[in-house]
Amino acid sequence: MGMLIKNGNVVMVEDGKIRKMDVLIDKGIIVEISPEINRSDVEVIDIEGKFLIPGLIDMHVHFRDPGYTHKEDIHSGSNAALAGGFTGVLMMPNTDPPPDNATVIYYWKEKSKSIPLNILFSGCITKNRAGKELSKFYELKEAGAVAITDDGNWVADGAVFRHAMEYAAALDLLVITHPEEPTIANRGVINEGYWSTVLGLRGIPKAAENIAIYRDIEIAKMTGAKLHVAHLSTAEGVRLVAAAKKLGLKVTAEVTPHHLVLTDEALAGYDTNLKVNPPLREAEEQKALLKGLLEGVIDVIATDHAPHASYEKNVEFNDAPFGIEGLETAFPVLYTELVLKKKITLEKLLLKMTVNPAKILQLPKQGDIKKGNYANLTVIDPKLTLKVSEELLVGKSKNNPFLGRTLTGWPVMTVYQGIVAYQRLLKGVQ
């Protein structure tokens, strides 16, 4: 049976337009978009007063499966993604065992095949993410990997990374770098600056990120490979990516919601849910990130969804793991803090969360609301205001930095290939 979504404020991202339209879906495909469509032989869903947007695509999630399923697993992570309005995610490889061979990719594929979510897979750059010996990229690509990364670790050996980039270029594989020079980061836990001094915590200098980005871009220039810079957090990093783009290099970059809306001042209370890597930076760095986003230097907003069990986070700040739970609150955080405050338009925000990640990951018929595209869609209620609580979150872990915050503009329905995969039930959570 088909589906007709009526009276939605449809955001056509690439056109930069919001129009009140009806959308007809048949066999998982958008077959018609028109001001008025009337059909009695399909399921009709009236979304008067709400936005219909392309399903969000997150290029950076950690589902912790296999190896750390007390934090998250593919099913719970997928539930969190769908609740957040996402219809596509790219899984990172810091699992145990890691996907440095086809076996883990096949495990992921088998476990995710019945889930109504486009789950994409990354393979490791090096065996065991140890930075020494290359994984078999061809085998990983044949198994289904769309990118390679040692995320969580930077490939510090320049010769190894050069060979990886040459190998990836030959296979047209995207390389995602985690830019942090470890000897400069030197076991820091927050941004090096005023707040690290006040709080008595070891700082992570911005130079650790900047030096890694500089080296990786230089190797991208040597090899012609596609390089994606994960979780930018510094003004200098933005400048380096901008310079690479001006040279015509195949370099793209992402930023997280938390780096766009929070600064290191938020750590004054030693909240371990705000302990992330890269760390939250000063307001000046945050302004540069937003400027880079608006100017097109930063292509993508990605959550870096990194769940941890409560007992792992409820320890001394130095001992707590890095990472936050980010999928479920990403859109309302950005809508509340950026769109409603007129720092970015809804259309431009969605460009970074739908069209651009679809292009970078080479996902055909995804990322926008167009005739012939897959019916991967999200309904947003722009007036729905909810207080973030542990009870509201559906993922396994609750390490969300926005707990207690009141946010507006929540996903209320997620449609994957013409099937309602998630619907928000509001009773008892407002």
UniProtKB/Swiss-Prot annotation:
GO BP of this protein: 'de novo' UMP biosynthetic process; purine nucleobase catabolic process
Cofactor annotation comment: Binds 2 Zn(2+) ions per subunit.
Q: Please provide, alphabetically and separated by semicolons, the GO molecular function terms listed in this UniProt record.
A: allantoinase activity; dihydroorotase activity; zinc ion binding
SUPFAM superfamilies referenced in this protein's UniProt entry, alphabetically:
Composite domain of metallo-dependent hydrolases, Metallo-dependent hydrolases
User: Does the UniProt entry include the keyword Translocase?
Assistant: no
Under Enzyme Commission nomenclature, its number is 3.5.2.3
Biological pathway: Pyrimidine metabolism; UMP biosynthesis via de novo pathway; (S)-dihydroorotate from bicarbonate: step 3/3
Mind telling me which GO cellular component terms the entry cites? cytoplasm
Q: Per UniProt, where does Zn(2+) 1 bind?
A: H60, H62, D151, D304
Binding annotation for Zn(2+) 2: D151, H178, H231
Q: Which family does it belong to?
A: Belongs to the metallo-dependent hydrolases superfamily. DHOase family. Class I DHOase subfamily.
Q: What does this protein do?
A: Catalyzes the reversible cyclization of carbamoyl aspartate to dihydroorotate.
Q: What is this protein called?
A: Dihydroorotase
What species is this protein from? Answer: Carboxydothermus hydrogenoformans (strain ATCC BAA-161 / DSM 6008 / Z-2901)
